[in-house]
Every structure is written in C-alpha cells, then in structure tokens.
C-alpha cells in the first residue's frame, strides 16, 4: 500500500461516515412542523401520579443576574423564560440566547412545586398556588454575590408555603428552597417535584439543523441514577407513551440540546420517582417526585432542589451533580473527545485563542503518532521494493491464486514486511478526526469562538470557503510528493480528483475541523520529507520524479 492508496482508504472511511450520518438522520427524523398551543398544563394521570392542575394566569416577575435573565410566573412559581446574556443568539447579534420559552409557537419551561396529600400543587387541593412577592423585578446589584427571590403562599387552613429562588453571581445553578410551616393540628404530607416540559417539534426559527453535512447532536430528555450514570430518553419514545417510571436515591433529570441544558437535581434523603410523560399538544415532560415527608403541627419542614439552566460547561456541571457533565454530547467517541477537549482547554488557558489551540493540539497529536507514521512509510517503501519480485511471481505462477497467496505471505515473512502496516495509522487518525468533529459540535466553549481574520466561529463553516480550498491544495501537494505504484487507469483518475472531492465535502464542515486537517496535512508533508531522507540512506526510497 502507498500514499495514493492511503487516500483511497481515507475516502472509503469518510464516505462510510457520511453514509452513517445519513442513516442516523433517517432513523431519527425530525417530527413534522406543527403549531403548539400555549399551555401551562403539566403531567396529569401519569404513571407517577404526577398530576398538577393548570397554572392559570399569574403575574410574571423578572429575575436578573450577570449570567441569567429569568421570567417566573407567580402562579406555581414556574420559570417560563430564560435568557443567557453571555451567549448571543447568533454571531454578532445583540440578542441573548433564549433557552426557556413560553410562546404560541414553542413551550419550554422549568416547573416545580409541592404535591403529596397536602401539597398546594396537588390538583385535589384546587388551582396551583398564587404566590405573593415583594416586587416585580429582582436584580443582582454590583458588589452583590447572591440574590434571593422569596415567594409566599398561605392556604385556607393557614399553612404557609415559602418558595425561594437563590441565584449566585456567575452561576447557572439556581437553588429552589421550600419552607413549610404547619399551622394546623394534623401532620402535613408533602412531596416536592421538579419537571421540565418542552414542545417536541422545533419551530422553524429555532431549527438550525439545515445542513445535510451537519452533525446532529442529541435533543431530548436524559436522567442519571446511581446505577445508570447517564441515560438518554428520546422525545419520540415519550410521544409514543413509552414512559420512564423508576425510583432512585439521588440522581437528576434533564432536557438536552446542542450546547445547552436544563436539569433538576433533587436534594433529599429519601427516594425520588423519575418519570416522563406525554402531556398532549405535542409536549413532552421529564421530572421527579420526592418521597413524601411529614411536617408535624406547629413545626417547619424544608425541601431543596437545584435547577441548572444554561450552557453545558463540564467542570461547573460536574460540581453541581455527579455525572451531570456527561450531558455534553460527544457521541460514541466520547472516550476520545473528552480527553481531547481537556487538553485543548488546557492549551487555551495559555494561548487564549481556540484556533491556535487547535493548531497546537494538531502538532501534539501528529507528534505522538510520528513513530506510527514512520512505520507506515517504511512499510510502504518495503512494499514498493518488493513489487518487482511480486510481479515476477505472478508471471511465473499464472492463475494459481492459492500458490501466489502462499508465496507472497512467505515473501512478506522473509522480508519482515507487514502488508497492512500502512493501514494502521489511518485507522487511528480517523477516530481522532471524528472525535474532534464531535468536540467542536458539542463543546459550548467553541460556539462562536473566533480564530483570526475572516474566521469568527470555529464551530461553523468557513463563510468564504478559503480553508476548504487550502485543505484541497495541501492534499494535492501530498499526492504529488508521494511515490505510487498505482497502474490502473481508473484508480489514477480517482486519485486525480480526490483533492477536489474532499474540498467539496469540507465546504460544509466546521472551520475548526478544516483547520485541523490543513495543519495535519502540512505536518504530514514535513514528516514525509524527513522520513524519505532516512529511507534514502537505507536504500528504500529514491528521489526520482513521480510518474503521472
């Protein structure tokens, strides 16, 4: 095998990847667009008995920190809107990214409350509680590190329920604390719940998966338990009423999309029921319900949970709850993407530019792989040296394929040549390439990350297609500099057009990925020349002009 055939192997692997991508798209098609009727109804009559009545109309209050802009409905205390000021909606946009939304076209809310026999959110006890608040807007002031938003409700029996949102500067984790004061003569049986509900179908203005070459990251529900660290739950499964219903001590429930996530993390000593539900009107939900606790007469009970609402920043998510960082969707190559990202982030802490970090990590990867690359070129050189003997063997043995195969293997053994030695480095490079692809499309740190000049977003395609063209040029030079034993006219034609074909494919790839491939090709050219000089000294390579 020589460098020309290497390109054929790469092309085969690449085409296989594209076919797999298309199959994934066909296997998990996006639901047909449909209008979602605005509603605040939550799961009713589900397997977990997680019934909550319609919210009705409450007052909307604004809660702002340096990183969160929330809108909370005083009817039930649900978070109906979440804006992320640190993350623009689009490149060069002044509008913040909206994670939670309540509109006629799209529903995505973080709901929570107190159910159980005596809970104010129990449908049997009437409408959801209408909380009282001191003001309509809460803002984290300069020099202030914590913002508390207390909401109180007193039922007909005189029992007081206080729901307090606690937000901290620079933090996407919101603590939701409940305080129950029993003013009656009987114990109160209370359970807490947290629920995330979302329209299954994305409206056109939110659906960004328009490119057939884009990597479609997971969008749906997920959960974690001590037994199952991370499990995805598809919206389609919920829509088919195949719902989750398990008990867990600890863990979390979440809804995921590219770069961003919401999650409820309950904090209690008992068990929680994790569930999903099809709420109708094209809305799916995932949530938890805690084990009931008793609040004795004249006593006060407390329940706590945490809501994560923001970007998938792995180290911060891991600090909030075990395994919450696994929500970053690195696909089936996560075991390569995760350490690759950690190394990339470490490099970025020194250079301050993600593009230069990609360049440096490319040099590191190719440096580590240099012994394999050298072995690859040495193996190919030995194979070329054996070609006259192999050709003479074929002429001598004619059509006796069995004897040809036997004598070729004996020749390889005698000359200490591995006929597959040229393939192994390629089989390693391809997973690294794909892992980098997953990393670019799954790491929020690389979303809208600029490099230099015209590249303002390494996770998006090059707007002027300059990088893909440069990549094609580097492939052309590698091809021209590589000796070949390809004699078949059809293979020669394919090899001639290979740089052009790859250039076309790479037009739609993230510019960070194309940058990696360009630098990798440039390193290949340098390593190739160094290796050829060593092979010349051993008589395994000559500098004669390559035949076209």
From Swiss-Prot:
Coiled coil: none
Pfam families the record matches: 60KD_IMP, YidC_periplas
Region (Disordered): 28-55
GO terms under biological process: protein folding; protein insertion into membrane; protein insertion into membrane from inner side; protein transport by the Sec complex; protein-containing complex assembly
Keywords linked to the UniProt accession: Cell inner membrane, Cell membrane, Chaperone, Membrane, Protein transport, Translocation, Transmembrane, Transmembrane helix, Transport
Interaction with SecF as annotated region, ranges: 215-265
Role according to the record: Inner membrane protein required for the insertion and/or proper folding and/or complex formation of integral inner membrane proteins. Involved in integration of membrane proteins that insert dependently and independently of the Sec translocase complex, as well as at least 2 lipoproteins. Its own insertion requires SRP and is Sec translocase-dependent. Essential for the integration of Sec-dependent subunit a of the F(0)ATP synthase, FtsQ and SecE proteins and for Sec-independent subunit c of the F(0)ATP synthase, M13 phage procoat and the N-terminus of leader peptidase Lep.
Protein name in UniProt: Membrane protein insertase YidC
Naturally occurring in which organism (per UniProt): Escherichia coli (strain K12)
């Amino acid at each position: 095998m020589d460098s020309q055939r290497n390109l054929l192997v790469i092309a085969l692997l690449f085409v296989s990847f594209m076919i797999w991508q298309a199959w994934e798209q066909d296997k998990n098609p996006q639901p047909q667009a449909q209008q979602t009727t605005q509603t605040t109804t939550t799961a009713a009559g589900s397997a977990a008995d997680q019934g909550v009545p319609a919210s009705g109309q409450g007052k909307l209050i604004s809660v702002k920190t340096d990183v969160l802009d929330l809108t909370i409905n005083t009817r039930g205390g649900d978070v109906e809107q979440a804006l992320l000021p640190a993350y623009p909606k689009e490149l060069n946009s002044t509008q913040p990214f909206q994670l939670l939304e309540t509109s006629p076209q799209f529903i995505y809310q973080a709901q929570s409350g107190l159910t159980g026999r005596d809970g104010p959110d129990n449908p049997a006890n009437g409408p959801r509680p209408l909380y009282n608040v001191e003001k309509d807007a809460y803002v984290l002031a300069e020099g202030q590190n914590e913002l508390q938003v207390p909401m109180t409700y007193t039922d007909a029996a005189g029992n007081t329920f206080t729901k307090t949102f606690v937000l901290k500067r620079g933090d996407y984790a919101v603590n939701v604390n409940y305080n129950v004061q029993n003013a009656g003569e009987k114990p109160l049986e209370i359970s807490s719940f947290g629920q995330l509900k979302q329209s299954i179908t994305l409206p056109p203005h939110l659906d960004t998966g328009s490119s057939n070459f884009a990597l479609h990251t997971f969008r749906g529900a997920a959960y974690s338990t001590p037994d199952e660290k991370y499990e995805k739950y598809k919206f389609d499964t919920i829509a088919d009423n195949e719902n989750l219903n398990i008990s867990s001590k600890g863990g979390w429930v979440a809804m995921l999309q590219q770069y961003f996530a919401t999650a409820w993390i309950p904090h209690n000593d008992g068990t929680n029921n994790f569930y999903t539900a099809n709420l109708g009107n094209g809305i799916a939900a995932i949530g938890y319900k805690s084990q009931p606790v008793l609040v004795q007469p004249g006593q006060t009970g407390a329940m706590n949970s945490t809501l994560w609402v923001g970007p998938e920043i792995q180290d911060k998510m891991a600090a909030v709850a075990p395994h919450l960082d696994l929500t970053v969707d690195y696909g089936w190559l996560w075991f390569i993407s995760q350490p690759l990202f950690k190394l990339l982030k470490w490099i970025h802490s020194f250079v301050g530019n993600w593009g230069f970090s990609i360049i440096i990590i490319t040099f590191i990867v190719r440096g580590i792989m240099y012994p394999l690359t050298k072995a690859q070129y040495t193996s190919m050189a030995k194979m070329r040296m054996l070609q006259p003997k192999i050709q003479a063997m074929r002429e001598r043995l004619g059509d006796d394929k069995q004897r040809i195969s036997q004598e070729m293997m004996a020749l390889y053994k005698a000359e200490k040549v591995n006929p597959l030695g040229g393939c192994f480095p390629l089989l390693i490079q391809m997973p690294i390439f794909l892992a980098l692809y997953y990393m670019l499309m799954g790491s929020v740190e690389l979303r809208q990350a600029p490099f230099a000049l015209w590249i303002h977003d390494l996770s998006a395609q090059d707007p002027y297609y300059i990088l893909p063209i440069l990549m094609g040029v580097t492939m052309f030079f590698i091809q021209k500099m590589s000796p070949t034993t390809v004699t078949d006219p059809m293979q020669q034609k394919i090899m001639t057009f290979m740089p052009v074909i790859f250039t076309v494919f790479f037009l739609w790839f993230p510019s960070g990925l194309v940058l990696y491939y360009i630098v990798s090709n440039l390193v290949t050219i340098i390593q190739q020349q160094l290796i050829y000089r060593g092979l010349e000294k051993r008589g395994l390579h000559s500098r004669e002009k390559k035949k076209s």
